[in-house]
């Protein structure tokens, strides 16, 4: 925008869309030299919409600076000239606050000189006319003011100020003028823009004075502040702080530092003193040295220094006659001195003795020398030491030592670990001679009676402390066809007794059977009546035929190999007119049919069984009815289920399941993490009786010892040399140990469910 001559205004008109209201901006620039600076002009703005006074101010402050603030008559004339007429006129930035008309932009009260009220205004009609309007282009009072209620809607008359954030360098008050501004500098500042700061000049400080200054506005200028202190050994004489005033003068003269003074000293009785005073007599840094006459010694420091606090470094020493400190009487000893009373002066002597059981450590006689020291330290009495003894194997030792570890009057008590017996004295004492009153005892392992394997069974024992000794564990299992009667595991207790009576192996029995009606029964019993291995032969009377198996055997599962047969009278029937559907043998099963009236004719009976490891699901026999229908559907053979294996340790398990998960023929292998060994079998197979061939193993840390290896060989004696040859035998023993059965037995119909070491087979079906 081009400049205009001083005192003239050139209006420019432009339209902008701002907040939905069309605004007409009248702006004028005045180019004039103020304090040798060019400043921008004040710009006036107004809204095209009418608002209440409050909303008018919001509008002005949002888009410009504020509601217009009238500064002089020329400004009023200019506004009346350039602003268009509006019938409800314009709001300006004056409002009644606390009953005083106030310029809201500066919060300054309106002065009488600046008032431009219309005639008979302000009149405050109805006591609510707190805001001011300006009559623009009014025929009766152009440019005059009138008080109005603030809620009335008028146009907002706004301005954009010449004063900016950095005007007057922020070091003075910016005062708006028409088209410009002037600066009223704060105290301590000067210049057209208040850009200069008053200076007080550099402070000259005396010797030993320390100064620390802060200069917020420049070195040694207005508001600079300097604090003073003294070097060590000096004290301040004068003000501790100076400040540069707005007048450019310091608040006071700088202080000076004087040396700190200590109290005067004199030589002690029977002594001399020599002093050095580098600054002043008995002042900071002065030092005095003291010496005592012959036959006396100084008590205290022989050199004193005057410190920065005005105090001597040590109290004044004294000279006292030479004497030795009283020696201490040794504990558990006695002392005899010459002279026996008074102070221990030069040439005094003392002798020492110890009580029984103690020996003197040091000189037995000492003398007070001319230096005030004894010729040797006072001795002490030490309890006689008894020799250390090895702690017996499997034993616990508890010693009380009143005068030191294993010394005179020490008492040691012995006890054996659980499962061991004490042989010898349970308590020994250290005597005054330095010897024990007896030898330490020994602990021998508790033994139980030898254990034998049950008949028709086997036994596996772990004996870490020797054959049939404490902590020995024996597990029992029976041969196939037998069940365990009694505990599966026995332990050798600390009392030397097994935890129970050895078990026996009893033959598994099948249910009792009887001769069929019109038939005969003949049985042979290997292991008792109807025990496992018993075989029964059936036959029928004359004119009767056998329906079913002629021979049945009691199996290891406690079941007969086939249902008992029946005897039926022989009759002649005509050929059947109907046939039942031909039957097929079930998978993994067997079928045997008796055709009385032709193949699969009426009364044909078919018997079904399953191969080893499979159980029948359905009827074990079907009969063909006269209607041509079988009495039931063909049964199926399902693989026997073993209990699911749940590993509660870190054992890794890998299983193959040919007939379904954890079924007959399933084989699981086990492995331990690196650094652990497998305790049990590396493999378990689901057997035909629904039990696993081996117990679940566990993982345990540690290595196999020679003693454990010998134990698993039944306690056989082998020389250490033989075991070491090539490491071969030890490796074989490790392999043997890993395969060792842990004694857990398969479940059978006579087992106690939940007994320690027995697999509980929840899938076992006792029905035929």
UniProtKB/Swiss-Prot annotation:
Protein name: P-selectin
Membrane topology: Single-pass type I membrane protein
Entry GO MF terms: calcium ion binding; calcium-dependent protein binding; fucose binding; heparin binding; integrin binding; lipopolysaccharide binding; oligosaccharide binding; sialic acid binding
Tissue: Stored in the alpha-granules of platelets and Weibel-Palade bodies of endothelial cells. Upon cell activation by agonists, P-selectin is transported rapidly to the cell surface.
Covalently lipidated residues, kind S-stearoyl cysteine: 745
Function: Ca(2+)-dependent receptor for myeloid cells that binds to carbohydrates on neutrophils and monocytes. Mediates the interaction of activated endothelial cells or platelets with leukocytes. The ligand recognized is sialyl-Lewis X. Mediates rapid rolling of leukocyte rolling over vascular surfaces during the initial steps in inflammation through interaction with SELPLG. Mediates cell-cell interactions and cell adhesion via the interaction with integrin alpha-IIb/beta3 (ITGA2B:ITGB3) and integrin alpha-V/beta-3 (ITGAV:ITGB3).
GO cellular component: external side of plasma membrane; extracellular space; membrane; plasma membrane; platelet alpha granule membrane
């Amino acid at each position: 925008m081009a400049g205009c001559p001083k005192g003239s205004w050139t209006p420019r008109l432009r339209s902008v869309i701002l907040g939905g209201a069309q605004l007409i901006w009248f702006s004028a620039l005045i180019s004039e030299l103020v304090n040798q600076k060019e400043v921008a002009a004040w710009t006036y703005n107004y809204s095209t919409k009418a608002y209440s006074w409050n909303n008018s101010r919001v509008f002005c402050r949002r888009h410009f600076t504020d509601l217009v603030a009238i500064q002089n008559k020329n400004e009023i004339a200019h506004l009346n000239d350039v602003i268009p007429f509006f019938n409800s006129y314009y709001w300006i930035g004056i409002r009644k606050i606390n009953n005083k008309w106030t310029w809201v932009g500066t919060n300054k009260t309106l002065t009488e000189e600046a008032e431009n009220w219309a005639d008979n205004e302000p009149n405050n009609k109805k006591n609510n006319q707190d805001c001011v309007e300006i009559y623009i282009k009014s025929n009766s009072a152009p440019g005059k003011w009138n008080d109005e209620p603030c809620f009335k809607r008028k146009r907002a008359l706004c301005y954009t100020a010449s004063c900016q954030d950095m005007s007057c360098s922020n070091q003075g008050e910016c005062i708006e003028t028409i088209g410009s501004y002037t600066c009223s500098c704060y105290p301590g500042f000067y210049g057209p823009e208040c850009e200069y700061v008053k200076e007080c000049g550099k402070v000259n400080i005396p010797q030993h004075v320390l100064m620390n200054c802060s200069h917020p506005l420049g070195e040694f200028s207005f508001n600079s502040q300097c604090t003073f202190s003294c070097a060590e050994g000096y004290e301040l004489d004068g003000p501790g702080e100076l400040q540069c005033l707005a007048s450019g003068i310091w608040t006071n003269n700088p202080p000076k530092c004087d040396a700190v003074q200590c109290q005067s000293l004199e030589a002690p009785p029977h002594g001399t003193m020599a002093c050095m005073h580098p600054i002043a007599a008995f002042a900071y840094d002065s030092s005095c040295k003291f010496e005592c006459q012959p036959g006396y010694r100084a008590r205290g420091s022989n050199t004193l220094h005057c410190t920065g606090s005005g105090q001597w470094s040590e109290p004044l020493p004294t000279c006292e006659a030479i004497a030795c400190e009283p020696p201490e009487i040794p504990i558990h000893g006695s002392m005899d001195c010459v002279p026996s009373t008074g102070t221990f002066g030069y040439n005094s002597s003392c002798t020492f003795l110890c009580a029984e059981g103690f020996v003197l450590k040091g000189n037995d006689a000492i003398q007070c020398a001319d230096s005030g020291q004894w010729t040797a330290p006072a001795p002490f009495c030490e309890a006689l030491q008894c020799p250390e003894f090895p702690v017996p194997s499997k034993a616990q030792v508890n010693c009380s030592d009143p005068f030191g570890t294993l010394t005179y009057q020490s008492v040691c008590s012995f006890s054996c670990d659980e499962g061991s017996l004490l042989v010898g004295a349970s308590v020994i004492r250290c005597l005054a001679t330095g010897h024990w009153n007896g030898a330490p005892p020994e602990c021998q392992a508790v033994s139980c009676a030898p254990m034998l394997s049950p008949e028709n069974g086997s036994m596996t024992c772990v004996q870490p402390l020797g054959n049939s000794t404490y902590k020995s564990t024996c597990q029992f299992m029976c041969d196939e066809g037998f069940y365990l009667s009694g505990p599966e595991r026995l332990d050798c207790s600390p009392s030397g007794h097994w935890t129970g009576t050895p078990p026996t192996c009893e033959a598994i029995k099948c249910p009792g059977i009887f001769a069929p009606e019109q038939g005969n029964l003949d049985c042979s019993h290997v292991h008792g009546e109807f025990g496992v291995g018993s075989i029964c032969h059936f036959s029928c009377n004359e004119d009767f035929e056998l329906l079913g198996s002629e021979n049945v055997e009691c199996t290891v599962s406690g079941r007969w190999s086939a249902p008992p047969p029946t005897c039926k009278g022989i009759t002649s029937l005509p050929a059947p007119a109907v046939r039942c559907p031909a039957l097929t043998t079930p998978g993994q099963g067997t079928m045997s049919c008796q055709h009385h009236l032709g193949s699969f004719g009426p009364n044909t009976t078919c018997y079904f069984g399953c191969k080893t490891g499979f159980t029948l699901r359905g009827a074990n026999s079907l009969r063909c009815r006269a209607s041509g229908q079988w009495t039931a559907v063909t049964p199926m053979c399902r693989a026997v289920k073993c209990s699911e294996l749940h590993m509660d340790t870190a054992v890794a398990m890998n299983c193959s399941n040919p007939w379904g998960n954890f079924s007959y023929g399933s084989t699981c292998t086990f492995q331990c993490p690196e650094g652990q060994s497998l305790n049990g079998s590396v493999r378990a197979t689901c057997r035909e009786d629904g039990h696993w061939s081996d117990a679940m193993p566990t993982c345990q840390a540690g290595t196999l010892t020679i003693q454990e290896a010998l134990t698993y060989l039944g306690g056989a004696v082998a020389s250490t040399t033989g075991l070491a040859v090539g490491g071969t035998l030890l490796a074989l023993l490790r392999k043997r140990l890993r395969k060792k059965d842990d004694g857990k037995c398969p479940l059978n119909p006579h087992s106690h469910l939940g007994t320690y070491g027995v697999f509980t087979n929840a899938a076992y079906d006792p029905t035929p």
